[in-house]
């Protein structure tokens, strides 16, 4: 299939052939949901912790005798039923949030997202994308001239000037072809891919 190749003015100057397998897939909502959910789950770090009844600093002495007081039975002050007691099912740093997605499914999910971007006219290819100096103003003006806002730029290797220029733009993300994740592809309104990055993605995913 053919993808539009645009210039720095945002005009379609030519077209570039692309893999039908990667950019011509049907949109599979269930598969995309599974891939995105797995990506977000695998990005989580188990850094939360709560105390169980064995972790709280409470005495193990029985608060009062078992019978004869008229009060409810109580074994120790660390009981989850008591204020200041432990939690019944506490969160732990050892929690495992990872979801496994087969490589074939992941590639198919990325392909479905890219294909949908093409159908929605949100994906463009550029010959190369460089910034002459590490200035946010230069990059912002270049993207404005191209008619791109809230854009993810995918390159074959990250140019230092481009990376430094994009850091202060919250709606711009620059990544290498091997690090284009499904969440970012769906989150940004536009995706701009350099020609060399397109070849790398086809080699890795098609």
Swiss-Prot record:
Pfam families xrefs: Ribosomal_L4 (PF00573)
Protein keywords: Ribonucleoprotein, Ribosomal protein, RNA-binding, rRNA-binding
Gene Ontology cellular component list: ribonucleoprotein complex; ribosome
S-S pairs: none
Gene Ontology biological-process annotations: translation
Region Disordered: start-end pairs: 50-77
Gene Ontology MF terms in the entry: rRNA binding; structural constituent of ribosome
Gene3D superfamilies named in the record: 3.40.1370.10
Biased composition (Basic residues): 59-70
InterPro entries membership: Ribosomal_uL4, Ribosomal_uL4-like, Ribosomal_uL4_dom_sf
Binding partners and assembly: Part of the 50S ribosomal subunit.
NCBIfam families: rplD_bact
Protein family per UniProt: Belongs to the universal ribosomal protein uL4 family.
The protein's role, per its UniProt record: One of the primary rRNA binding proteins, this protein initially binds near the 5'-end of the 23S rRNA. It is important during the early stages of 50S assembly. It makes multiple contacts with different domains of the 23S rRNA in the assembled 50S subunit and ribosome. Forms part of the polypeptide exit tunnel.
Name the record gives this protein: Large ribosomal subunit protein uL4
Source organism of this protein record: Nitrosospira multiformis (strain ATCC 25196 / NCIMB 11849 / C 71)
Source lineage: Bacteria, Pseudomonadati, Pseudomonadota, Betaproteobacteria, Nitrosomonadales
Gene: rplD
